Amino acid sequence: MAAEEGGDGRRNMGNPPPPAPAESEEEDDNEMEVEDQDGKEAEKPNMINFDTSLPTSHMYLGSDMEEFHGRTLHDDDSCQVIPVLPHVMVMLIPGQTLPLQLFHPQEVSMVRNLIQKDRTFAVLAYSNVREREAHFGTTAEIYAYREEQEYGIETVKVKAIGRQRFKVLEIRTQSDGIQQAKVQILPERVLPSTMSAVQLQSLSRRHIFPSSKPKVWQDRAFRQWWQKYQKRKFHCASLTSWPPWLYSLYDAETLMERVKRQLHEWDENLKDESLPTNPIDFSYRVAACLPIDDALRIQLLKIGSAIQRLRCELDIMNKCTSLCCKQCQDTEITTKNEIFSLSLCGPMAAYVNPHGYIHETLTVYKACNLNLSGRPSTEHSWFPGYAWTIAQCRICGNHMGWKFTATKKDMSPQKFWGLTRSALLPRIPEAEDELGHDRSPLLCL
C-alpha cells in the first residue's frame, strides 16, 4: 500500500517517510474526496475466487528474498539481552508475521548484524506510546531478507515472525543509538485436563476425537455428535460436586471448538485443517486476528495460559458487536457480522507500505460513515488484482483504511474494505459498579 494515507493518517503512523520519487499521474492535484455510496449495499458473494495465499506471501516486498530456516527459542524464565528495532509500533503476537521496510541507516546496520547472529530482535508492546513505556513484548525472528538500493538510499526488506513473550527488566541505549533490552522470557503454563483428578488414564484415551467427526459445522449431525462426545468426555463429573458444564468452561478442546464456531461465521470457507491443533498456537492465531485496540491486546499478551487466553478471546468475540472510529468513538464503521477472511492468516494481518508504515488490516464486506479520498491505485497493493482507495471517517476525517475494488469483472468479491486496527475501537458494553459508574470491560478469565 502506498503511503498516500491522507494528511492526518500519515502523521499518525510512526516512521517519517524516506525521500520518494515524483508523484504518479494517479496522485495528481485533482484529488477527490467523496462520500462512499455503495458501502452499505455491498453483499457477501456466494463464493470467493481470490487466491488467499497471496496476501500471506507479501509479494509486494519482492519475490527474490533470501530465506532462512530453523528457529531460535530461548529457555523459559531465562534472562536475555536482545536488541530493540526502533520505530516499530506494533504489538506483536507470537506466530504473527511482521513485514518490514527499513530505510534508516541505524536500522539497516542493525538488521545486517542480526543476520550474522541469531536473527532475533525485540518488539516492545508500548502501553503508553507517547511516553515510550513498555513492560512486555515479543521476540521476533527474521525468516526472509533482502537488501536493495532505491534512489541512492539503502533499504532492507524483512519478513519476521513473532516467537516468545517476554517481560522487560531493563532497557539501555548504546553509543550507536541502538537500544538493548534485558528481558525475561515468559513461559506458557500448560494446565492439566479438567477431569485428570477423577479420571483413569486408561479411560482418557477413549476421549480422543474419533474419525467419525462430521466436517460440516452447520450440520445437525455435528451438533448431535458434539453433545454425545461432551457427555462421554465429562461423565466423570458425576463423581464430583460440580456439574459437567463447569468443567467444560476450562477445557482447552471445548474452548477451541467454541472459538472455531465464531471463526466459521467470519469465514464460511475456513477449513479446520488450516488451523493449529495445539491450544497455545491456536490461541495466538486467534489473538492476532481479533480487531481489538492495544488496551485489550496487551491483556491477551500478558496471559500465560492458553486456556485463560481462549476464554478471554471467546469473551471478546461474544461481546464485541461493532467497530467504531477510534477518534470519534461513537461513529460506527462496521459490525462483526461483516468480517470475513481473504487471507490464510485470517481476517486480519500486518502489511507494510513503501514508507515503512505497518498496518494491521481487517477485511470486511461492508462499512459505513466513510469518505473516499484520491483515485483508485493498484500500486503496491497488498491484495493483487485489487485497486485501493483511501477511506476516511466521514465525521472527523481520521484515516480508517482503504476500499478495495477488483480490476477484473470475474473476481470475487468485487469490492471490500481493509480497515486498519489502529483506527478502530471495539464497541464492548461496559459494566457498572455498585455505584452505577462505568468500568472498563472486564474480560472473562
Curated annotation (Swiss-Prot):
Per the record, where are the segments of Acidic residues compositional bias? 23-36
Q: Which domain of life is it from?
A: Eukaryota
In terms of InterPro entries, this protein maps to: CULT (IPR034750), Lon_prtase_N (IPR003111), Lon_prtase_N_sf (IPR046336), PUA-like_sf (IPR015947), Yippee/Mis18/Cereblon (IPR004910)
Q: Name any Gene Ontology BP term.
A: proteasome-mediated ubiquitin-dependent protein catabolic process
Region (Disordered), start-end ranges: 1-50
Q: Name one GO cellular component term.
A: nucleus
Q: Where is the CULT domain?
A: 320-428
Residue pairs linked by disulfide bridges in the UniProt entry: none
Pathway in which this enzyme or protein is active: Protein modification; protein ubiquitination
Domain Lon N-terminal, by residue range, is: 82-321
Family matches, as CDD domains: CRBN_C_like
Keywords of the record: Cytoplasm, Metal-binding, Nucleus, Ubl conjugation pathway, Zinc
User: Any idea which positions bind Zn(2+)?
Assistant: C325, C328, C393, C396
Q: Extract the SMART domains matched here.
A: LON (SM00464)
**Subcellular location, in the record's words?**
Cytoplasm; Nucleus
Q: Where does (S)-thalidomide bind?
A: H380, W382, W388
- Please give the Gene Ontology molecular function terms for this protein: metal ion binding
Pfam families, per database record: LON_substr_bdg (PF02190), Yippee-Mis18 (PF03226)
Q: Main subcellular localization, coarse class?
A: cytoplasm
Gene3D superfamilies (UniProt xref): 1.20.58.1480, LON domain-like, Peptide methionine sulfoxide reductase
Into which family does the record put it?
Answer: Belongs to the CRBN family.
Q: How does it assemble?
A: Component of a DCX (DDB1-CUL4-X-box) protein ligase complex. Interacts directly with DDB1.
Q: What function does the entry list?
A: Substrate recognition component of a DCX (DDB1-CUL4-X-box) E3 protein ligase complex that mediates the ubiquitination and subsequent proteasomal degradation of target proteins, such as MEIS2. Normal degradation of key regulatory proteins is required for normal limb outgrowth and expression of the fibroblast growth factor FGF8. Maintains presynaptic glutamate release and consequently cognitive functions, such as memory and learning, by negatively regulating large-conductance calcium-activated potassium (BK) channels in excitatory neurons.
Q: What else is known?
A: Thalidomide is teratogenic in human, chicken and zebrafish, but not in mice. Binding of thalidomide and related drugs changes the substrate specificity of the human DCX (DDB1-CUL4-X-box) E3 protein ligase complex, leading to decreased degradation of endogenous target proteins and increased degradation of other proteins that are not normal substrates. This is probably the underlying cause of the teratogenic activity of thalidomide, possibly due to abnormal regulation of the BMP and FGF8 signaling pathways.
Q: What is this protein called?
A: Protein cereblon
Species this chain originates from: Gallus gallus
